[in-house]
Amino acid sequence: MGDDIMPISNLAKESEVRAVKDIPCKNIETDNHLEIGLSSGLSRSKDTSKFKKNSINTIKLIDDIIALHNDPKGNKLLWNDNWQDKIINRDLANIFEKIDESVSELGGLEMYQEMVGVNPYDPTEPVCGLSAQNIFKLMTEGEHAVDPVEMAQTGKIDGNEFAESVDQLSSAKNYVALVNDRRLGHMFLIDIPSNDQETVGYIYQSDLGQGALPPLKIADWLNSRGKDAVSLNKLKKLLSREFNLLSDDEKRALISETLDIHKDVSNVELDRIKRDRGVDIYLTEYDVNNFYENIETLKSKLSNYDKKLSKPK
């Protein structure tokens, strides 16, 4: 895909996907907080246990994201809400300078922690929106910056349109879906990598735990289930109106199988699902080479920053 990110509705001729009407949306918010989850893709096979990723070592990319998250400085580079600039152009010195300014404005670190409740210098545990949107930037940014909030405002489709579209995606291309499930109060990413065998999806997500699912840390998910394929049929059933036709037990089973780290049905609180809310999805093609190069650039930036700090003055 080129540097201009387009929704699937604008890629119909390339992907042979039925065009869908873009609906403007002022903001991407769940009922609790901004989130978006990552991963998951499509599967035309009932058995996904034998499937292996065949892109630019996607497993290594996930491990690199975990490593960046676990590094105190890499963490600050990765989880930031500056959507206007490219993720690889983020400046660590500038990030920490802004933290210093915020702390100073509130009268020092002790006062800041008392008022805000966190130490701003500590590593960030991103809510679902922060993790999903930043990984979306990692995957889709080429020459130009990508604003995931703006993209989703101008190119969203609903769960039924997603279910109709995914079966028609080209198996030779990579796609990513930014999902705002307002029923669950949750956002996550679905990575749909190219494959010459069977098409499946991978979910990237974290969760503050204020919706239908328990709290979830991004590294815990990526280490435990980030490399597990999710079938197309389950994703379509989860995100479309077909979900409403399921029994309560079937709903719990489906949600836990796709989104709970332990696949534990008891972790799903159906009474917290807002049945009158919908699902908004931004589905677009991405270049896996950009994904790889962006992660490598962040790793290099972090390494250079560490070397600079270690030089004697």
From Swiss-Prot:
Catalytic-site annotation from UniProt: 128, 186, 205
Reaction equations catalysed: L-glutaminyl-[protein] + H2O = L-glutamyl-[protein] + NH4(+)
Source species of the chain: Photorhabdus laumondii subsp. laumondii (strain DSM 15139 / CIP 105565 / TT01) (Photorhabdus luminescens subsp. laumondii)
Effect of substituting residue 128 to S: Abolished ability to inhibit the host cell cycle. Abolished accumulation of the cyclin-dependent kinase inhibitors CDKN1A/p21 and CDKN1B/p27
Any coiled-coil regions, as ranges: none
EC number: 3.5.1.44
Keywords: Host nucleus, Hydrolase, Secreted, Toxin, Virulence
Protein name as catalogued: Protein-glutamine deamidase Cif
Main location: secreted
